[in-house]
């Protein structure tokens, strides 16, 4: 209604989960990953509550453009009749903020370090532009990078002072008390392969 661009936190969570899972299907995810994001995929078991919460990301003064698209026949890849459409894009250089909250409940104490490692991997992926957001990412859209280093606050609910901080918590005034290096070790995904080579355009290339 206000004309702001919005990326829903639930959509960002799904992107992060897929990044952490790599090429695995949901049913093959490690148990600690299912516990972190919640599990409601196997109807024969009880659903589990998510332990990670991600804020909606707002771009308050979006610079929006339009691109043309055309729907293709699935197998022949020939353009279908009367199938032209437009889609909106956000131009490069625009900024948004993501807030991530991870809660380690008593029943998940055994997963504490795994949760921290997953969070460290998410932050590492953001800082090194390994994570893309939005549609048509295979065509080069949605690449993001971190403008400023993430700030991290860890609260211990067995300490009175941390409990009071939690009760009166304000994202705008909280003070970081740990670093990414102290948080955990990113769990490396083995599905990423980088190949660098020189190529020759043998025939005409349309760009």
Language model feature labels by segment:
Residues 1-207:
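Small/polar/charged residue-enriched interaction surfaces, especially the RNA/DNA-contacting tracks
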